[in-house]
Amino acid sequence: MSFSPSIAGLSGPLSALSDALTTAPESAFASLGSVFLTRLPAAPLSAPYVVGFSAETAALLGLEPGIENDPAFAELFSGNATREWPAEALPYASVYSGHQFGVWAGQLGDGRALGLGEVEHGGRRFELQLKGAGRTPYSRMGDGRAVLRSSIREYLCSEAMHHLGIPTTRALCVIGSDQPVRRETVETAAVVTRVAPSFVRFGHFEHFYSNDRTDALRALADHVIERFYPHCREADDPYLALLNEAVISTADLMVEWQAVGFCHGVMNTDNMSILGLTIDYGPFGFMDGFDAGYICNHSDSQGRYAYRMQPQIAYWNLFCLAQGLLPLLGEKHEESVRGDKAIEDAQRVLGGFKDRFAPALERRMRAKLGLETERAGDDALANRLFEVMHANRADFTLTFRNLARVSKHDASGDAAVRDLFLDRAAFDAWVNDYRARLSEETREDAARAIAMNRVNPKFVLRNHLAETAIRRAKEKDFSEVERLAAVLRRPFDEQPEHEAYAGLPPDWASSLEVSCSS
């Protein structure tokens, strides 16, 4: 059922979009029913206005640039327009559980996010979700709001990660308001519109497992299989095949994160996507100076989610997912041995994580070093580089980008990367071995540099860049948000006119801290 566009004051493309959102197909997540979600309108947001808008993401939904200038756009994506939607088509908050910082946290759920529904365009379907849309039954002690700074960070990073080639939720827009929100200080409220094929998390499976709701667990798994992994239905054990897909996509995602120095910050099981997407951008960070133990989240005092721990934590989280799926596994076995066989099968599939992750990361590192062929000492060469980078806190992004200038013939191109290291002798020792390795390659320097610059970005969302955009946005100057977003859409291009966005962070950036408070 759809609502009358005239009731909500919408017309044209926004009316059509709203009509689609309130008419859920049978295969949509929202059609799973009240066991999985609670419907409610978004909380009112006073005098909403557009802070940032992604024309690329809008195109995925069939929206044209300029639509953000329609006053009704801010009303819809602030959630205000949903207050006039019929009860059966209201936005929804889903329930899930999970492990937070390694401890079972019990029931969680969308505490400040509301699903709007699904849109189909160009043969693809996307679910839309408003983060910061107000309290839900799962808000616990929270106020259900998001603040401007965290919303801008998520908007920018969602789009930046996509253009780095990393699986991620997308961001359509940020809607701001002067409505006050109290955190450590008084800030202003904002809503970011997330766009993804699905927002199903590991924690959804954990929830129904922990509540002994095998019927709901099966319905959820069937939904994911039918929508995203239909080939699993042909497997001997479809649910084991689903687990295998999660292992593969999660391992691949960890390769992508590690390869660009990205640290998520809150890898709780409720923040892990069943599709292997990067979701829930909170206290994330791209490393500046390389530190294997880099902790981007000020709240992570034990370093559980440090950079070097991310693959291990992803593996641990997959164990939690496997446990959640156990009641569905092993149906092909006789009842007397089903439980033991299910565990054996799950352990075997989980073992595939290392088999997938390790060689994929090795291949990525060879590409980052510009090596076409494989040699026995390549891993050691890469590891030695990281050791020297760690000892010197050499900038992660600039080190790999500038390695493209190193010549296999002489030291004429070394300076750009050498200057990033305080211990020049240590770097020289490494680069001489690197040059010797390059001499074994048939590809010439120019061709190698082009290839390296396709995998080593020049531009990433450094914290100080986001902070500058946020500070200006707080003064109602949103130009830097869009300027930075435009730069990040071309991370591998030289963009000489934007050289300042690729430089080392200023001294004041060292005092920046991000935490779970958002």
Swiss-Prot record:
Protein's name according to its UniProt entry: Protein nucleotidyltransferase YdiU
Organism: Paraburkholderia xenovorans (strain LB400)
Enzyme Commission code(s) on record: 2.7.7.-, 2.7.7.108
Active site: 270 (proton acceptor)
Catalytic activity: L-seryl-[protein] + ATP = 3-O-(5'-adenylyl)-L-seryl-[protein] + diphosphate; L-threonyl-[protein] + ATP = 3-O-(5'-adenylyl)-L-threonyl-[protein] + diphosphate; L-tyrosyl-[protein] + ATP = O-(5'-adenylyl)-L-tyrosyl-[protein] + diphosphate; L-histidyl-[protein] + UTP = N(tele)-(5'-uridylyl)-L-histidyl-[protein] + diphosphate
Binding-site positions, ATP: 109, 111-112, 131, 143-144, 194, 201, 280
Source domain of life: Bacteria
Lineage: Bacteria, Pseudomonadati, Pseudomonadota, Betaproteobacteria, Burkholderiales
Keywords tagged on the record: ATP-binding, Magnesium, Manganese, Metal-binding, Nucleotide-binding, Nucleotidyltransferase, Transferase
